[in-house]
Amino acid sequence: MDFLEAQNYLEKVRSQKGIVLGLDTMRHLMAKLNNPQDKVKFIQVAGTNGKGSTAAYLTSILSEAGIKVGRYTSPAVFSSTEQYFACGSCISESEYAKGVTAVAEAAASLDGETPTAFEQETALAFWYFAQKGCELAILEAGLGGDMDATNIVTTTVCSIITSISMDHCRILGNKISEIAAHKAGIIKPGAPVICIEQKEDAMEPIRAAAKAADTPLYEVHRDEVRQIFSDKRESIVFFREFENLHLKMLGSCQPENAALAVQAASVLSRSYPIEKKHIYDGIEKTRWGGRFELHSGSPDIILDGAHNPDGIRRLRESVNQMFGAVPICYVCGVLADKDYEKEIEILFGRASNVFTVTPPSPRAMKSTDLKAAIKKRFSQLKVTSFDSEDGIEKAMEAAVSQNNPVVVCGTLTILARVKEWMKCNNRL
C-alpha cells in the first residue's frame, strides 16, 4: 500500500466496524506482529479532557532530556500522521504506509476476528515505536481505559489521569464514579500514578485502584497551580517549587495540564536523566494544535476542539479571560451523540452571532438541527446555518466579516477544514 491506500484502508475498516471495547482481539493482533509493544516502556494517559495537551507537554520535556520518546494520540485532527510521533518528528507517509501494510496483513491472518480501525491504528503505533527504538512512549487512551486497545501494554512505568467528566456515557456509564473506574483501569502495579484533583466520586475508584496495585498516587491539587500572568502570547504559572513556568499554549485548562506533566517528569526523574532545565524548556516549547489555538488578526480566530460540557465550560472561561466583554462570533458544529443541549446552555449566553455547520462525520448533527436547538434556548440570538458541501468555508467567510473575535468549536472534526480555509485565505 502507498500512503493514500493505507488511509483509505483504515477508513474502510472504520466504516464497517465501529467501537468495540475489549483486549482479546488486540492481543491476538499484536502476537501476529511479534508483540513489538514489549520492546518499549510506556506512560499511559487517560481522562476526559486534557490528555493530548498533557501528553504534548511531557513529550517535550522528555525530548529536552535527550530521551528517545514516542507519542500516540487520537483522533487525528489535521493529518493522519500527526497521531504518531517518535524521536523528534511525526511518522513519514512512507513509514505510515509500510506500517499499515504490516498491520493489515496481520489482521487478515486472524482466524474469525476483524480488528477495528482504532485497534489497527494502535497496532501501528506499537510497530512504529519499536521500529524507531523509543525508550519511552506516551499512550493516550482512546475511550475509557481498562478495555481500551492501548491497555494491552505490560511495561508501563507511569500512569497519568487527567480531568474526568461526563462523556461517552452510553459506553462508560452515567455516573462519574463509573467513568473514573474505567479510566483507573490503566493503573499498573509498580507504575506510579499522577492524577489531577477530581470530584470525590471520581477520586474514590482511582485511589482504590492505586491501592490495589500497591503503587503510589500523586494528586495534583488545583490550588497548587497558580497562573500569575496571561496575555495573547503566553501565561506564567507557579506549581510547587516550579516558579515562572512559561506556557505558550493558551486556555484556562493548560496550567493544570502542564502541572500534571511536571509532576510526572519529577517522578520519572528518579529513573531517567530529567533535570529542572528540561522541564522548564520543555513546557515553554510545547505546542498542540486545536486547543485554544489563537491566530491573531483582524479579527482574531480561536480554534478549539472542545466537545463535551466540561471542555465547553473551560473554553468559555478562556474566551472570557482573553476577550472580556467583547462580543464573540461562533462557528460551531457538533456530533449528535454529544450533550449538545448543555453545551449550548454553557457557551452561547454572550454570543453576538452563531454560524452552525455540519461536521464531516457520520455521527454529525445537521447544521439546521443545531440551529433549532440553539434558537430554542436563546430565541433572540442571531443564528445562521450552512448546509452546503462548502458550508464550513461559507460559515468562516460570514464569521470573519463580522469583525469580532471568531471561536471555532464543538468538535475536532471541523478544525482541519477551517485551517485549510485559513491557509487559502492567508490567515495562518
Where are the regions that the model predicts?
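Short functional linear segments
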Residues: 1-47, 54, 60-67, 72, ...
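Beta-strand->loop->alpha-helix junctions that form or flank phosphate-binding loops
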Residues: 72-74, 196-197, 209-231, 248-252, ...
